[in-house]
Amino acid sequence: VTNMHFQIARRGWIGDYVDPNNFLDLFITGGGNNNTGFADPEYDEMILRKAPQAATREERFAVFHEAETLLMEQMPILPVYTYTSKHLVHHSVKGLPPNLMDSLNLKYVWLEDNEQATKTDD
């Protein structure tokens, strides 16, 4: 895929930070993760210059929306599915907050002893 010797290929990307740019940055011309061959100077301008220079969050997101619209009109990719996951967590597990990235950081997780957990459930 990296050498662009394909007619169709399947690729995946899991966001590593919560921001639209995490996905939109994948399609800039010559970008290290742009294995599509997509190249558009207008798109690059929006992602590399306009969005970073936006004065407000709303303005930045409007630029991202415009870039995403351009990307979907040119359709260098065909989104097939999105990753989902569910977690069953025992009631004695504490300190495991949900997060948008669905990453499990177990650093601050602890198990409440069974006696305390049983009292809490009643």
What are these regions (language model features)?
Residues V1-D122:
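Detector for C-terminal structural segments
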